């Protein structure tokens, strides 16, 4: 099914998702290995996890309404971010343009009402050197972030990273 035909992402319980992942999104379905997570995910349309995963669906619409092109672009962006693992091993994933848009907007349920979400294209323009500075700021010290004041990753993106986006 084409991404444009999917209204909201749905969660599915499965055995194959590694325990280190909350969800793995494939073609509009968020796979997880926790039945309670599925229940919570599917309960309301405006919970942040569902909004986050639905943003990925809208991103696929923005890439010629193709899952294949979306996943190829996603893989390419992950590979491009590999230098970030010198700071923290999962930074290559967390600071990808698609993830930055999804984390930034996951608390705005109205964001998924758009036909497509393409702010990731602006995040993509941020140089790796600049992203690496933000990775260091986020993972400052030994912790897993946030670096100050119990800031969420969404708040961190809005406060620091979005200032590098074109007007």
Task: Describe each PLM feature range.
Residues 2-21, 68-167:
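Metalloprotease/metallohydrolase-associated module, dominated by Zn2+-dependent proteases
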Residues 10, 44-46, 53, 96:
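Intrinsic disorder/low-complexity signature
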Residues 23-50:
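Short pre-active-site segment immediately N-terminal to the catalytic Zn-binding motif
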Residues 28, 60, 141-145:
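Residue-identity detector for glycine
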Residues 31, 37, 55, 64-65, ...:
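Short, solvent-exposed loop/turn segments at secondary-structure junctions
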Residues 54-72:
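Catalytic Zn2+-binding segment of zinc metalloproteases
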């Amino acid at each position: 099914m084409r991404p444009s035909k999917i209204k909201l992402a749905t969660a599915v319980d499965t055995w194959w998702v590694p325990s280190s992942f909350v969800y793995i999104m494939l073609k509009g379905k968020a796979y997880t290995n926790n039945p309670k997570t599925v229940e919570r995910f599917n309960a309301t349309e405006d919970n942040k996890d569902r909004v986050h995963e639905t943003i990925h669906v809208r991103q696929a619409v923005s890439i010629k309404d193709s899952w294949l092109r979306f996943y190829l672009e996603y893989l390419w962006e992950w590979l491009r971010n590999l230098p970030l693992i010198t700071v923290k091993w999962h930074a290559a994933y967390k600071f990808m343009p698609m993830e930055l848009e999804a984390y930034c907007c996951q608390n705005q349920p109205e964001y998924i009402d758009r036909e497509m979400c393409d702010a990731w294209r602006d995040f993509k323009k941020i140089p790796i050197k600049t992203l690496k500075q933000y990775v260091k700021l986020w993972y400052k010290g030994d912790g897993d972030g946030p670096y100050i004041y119990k800031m969420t990753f969404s708040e961190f993106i809005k406060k620091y990273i979005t200032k590098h986006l074109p007007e």
